[in-house]
Structure formats: structure tokens, C-alpha cells
From Swiss-Prot:
Residues 241-257 have a biased composition (Basic and acidic residues). One of its GO terms (cellular component) is chromatin. Keywords: Developmental protein, DNA-binding, Dwarfism, Homeobox, Nucleus. It holds the Pfam family Homeodomain. GO terms for biological process: dorsal/ventral neural tube patterning; embryonic skeletal system morphogenesis; forebrain development; gastrulation; middle ear morphogenesis; muscle organ morphogenesis; negative regulation of Wnt signaling pathway; neural crest cell fate specification. Residues 213-257 are annotated as: Disordered. Its main location: nucleus. GO terms for molecular function: DNA-binding transcription factor activity, RNA polymerase II-specific; DNA-binding transcription repressor activity, RNA polymerase II-specific; RNA polymerase II cis-regulatory region sequence-specific DNA binding; RNA polymerase II-specific DNA-binding transcription factor binding; sequence-specific double-stranded DNA binding. Belongs to the paired homeobox family. Bicoid subfamily. It comes from Homo sapiens. This is Homeobox protein goosecoid. It is found in: Nucleus.
Length: 257
């Protein structure tokens, strides 16, 4: 391994910005692939060669033919362990793997010579989502197994939690008053109320949907309680009837005596 990779200038080199990051491909088959930055929903390398931040950590992914990728590649295609997933966008010279020869600009098409594992076919299929750049110096992405990559994807691509709207007392009072008048207000009524309480019409619509669901649950629970009360009254009356009969019989005997 060249000693220049561990020089002070190489270690302290500034990390390139996300906007300037693309996937580099050097002419040498042994050149490393650099993944220093984060860009959108895909992981890209830095523009340049092996002199970037994390050039020494990642082996260069090579297609089965042994040749490299085109000189300028963008999109969501990423290679691990000689497999490439996602889309391939060729922007520069018509250069490609040995099995394809010269590759013209493909746009969102895929190179048929590059194998894709089962379950990841189709355009836009990406196995791994962006990896935080803080983790890159400590992991060799090229040596991760498929299961590890899927776990990494699940950890990083969790759905963001939506923020819950907090209504004021005045807003809740106005919404509740309108709900008592009508359970299904039209768009004009919702817009008028939204302007009155300084809310968006979408928020008012969502509140009414949730309020109707709560109202249906309360109505269902109250009906179930009334049914249970009726059943309890019937069972209690049936149990008390023999006792009443005994009392009536005793009273009849007393009257005869």
C-alpha cells in the first residue's frame, strides 16, 4: 500500500461537499472506490482519485468482465462484492465493462451484463441507502455481507416520525362546536373555520376525521354497555323469580291459617 495514503496532507484533506461528490473510476483496476460523502438518497464517492478522504478503506468493485465502470457515473447504482444494484446513469465518455464494449448514454437503463441479485430487479432498486459519513472511516463497505447491508439499510432508512399538531383551547372549542353542528362539514365550512382559528384546511380535515373515529368508538362502546346492562337485568330477574314464588307461597299459607 503506498505510503502517501497515510501522509498528513492526505489524512487532513478536506471532505468534499455533497453537491460535488460523484462516483470516481480511475483507469487502474486496483484503484480504490471512495465513499466520503452523502448525496440525496444515494451514496457516492468523491470526485478525484485515491487521494480523497477514505480512499484507502474501500476496494474497487469490478464487474464480472474485469473492467471498471464508465468515467463519470451518477444515479443510485452502487456496487458491493462485484454486484451493482439500482440505476446506471452514464454522463461522459462511452466506456463500459468488457462484456458490453462501448456503452452509450443509457439514462435510466440498466447494463444487462451486470448481475442483479433476486429481489432487486427493476429500475431504481437500491440495496443500501446512504451511510452517514461519520461511519465511513470505520467500516469497509466492500466486505459487508448482504444481510449486513440490509440491516444497515433498515437502521438508516427508518421512517421519520411526523410531528403532531398541538391545538390551543380556543381552536379545540371552535372545532368541537362545529362538530356538534355537523359531523361532515364541506370544504367551504372547513376553510372558513380554518381562517377563523388560524389553521390550515388540511389540519381541520384531519381533526374531523380523527374526531369522527373517536365518536364512532364512543357510540359503539355505549351501545355495548347498554346491551350488557339489559342482559344483566334479564339474568337477575330470572334468578329472583324462584325466590318471589317462595315468598308468595308462604304468604298464601299464612293467609289460609
Amino acid at each position: 500500500m503506498p505510503a502517501s495514503m497515510f501522509s498528513i496532507d492526505n489524512i487532513l484533506a478536506a471532505r468534499p461537499r455533497c453537491k460535488d461528490s460523484v462516483l470516481p473510476v480511475a483507469h487502474s483496476a486496483a484503484a480504490p472506490v471512495v465513499f466520503p460523502a452523502l448525496h440525496g438518497d444515494s451514496l457516492y464517492g468523491a470526485s478525484g482519485g485515491a487521494s480523497s478522504d477514505y480512499g484507502a478503506f474501500y476496494p474497487r468493485p469490478v464487474a464480472p468482465g474485469g473492467a471498471g465502470l464508465p468515467a463519470a457515473v451518477s444515479g443510485s447504482r452502487l456496487g458491493y462484492n462485484n454486484y451493482f444494484y439500482g440505476q446506471l446513469h452514464v454522463q461522459a465518455a462511452p466506456v463500459g465493462p468488457a462484456c458490453c464494449g462501448a456503452v452509450p448514454p443509457l439514462g435510466a437503463q440498466q447494463c444487462s451484463c451486470v448481475p442483479t441479485p433476486p429481489g432487486y430487479e427493476g429500475p431504481g432498486s437500491v440495496l443500501v441507502s446512504p451511510v452517514p459519513h461519520q461511519m465511513l472511516p470505520y467500516m469497509n463497505v466492500g466486505t459487508l455481507s448482504r444481510t449486513e447491508l440490509q440491516l444497515l439499510n433498515q437502521l438508516h432508512c427508518r421512517r421519520k416520525r411526523r410531528h403532531r399538531t398541538i391545538f390551543t383551547d380556543e381552536q379545540l372549542e371552535a372545532l368541537e362546536n362545529l362538530f356538534q353542528e355537523t359531523k361532515y362539514p364541506d370544504v367551504g365550512t372547513r376553510e372558513q373555520l380554518a381562517r377563523k382559528v388560524h389553521l390550515r384546511e388540511e389540519k381541520v380535515e384531519v381533526w374531523f376525521k380523527n374526531r369522527r373515529a373517536k365518536w364512532r368508538r364512543q357510540k359503539r362502546s355505549s351501545s355495548e354497555e347498554s346491551e350488557n346492562a339489559e342482559k344483566w337485568n334479564k339474568t337477575s330477574s330470572s334468578k329472583a323469580s324462584p325466590e318471589k314464588r317462595e315468598e308468595e307461597g308462604k304468604s298464601d299459607l299464612d293467609s289460609d291459617s
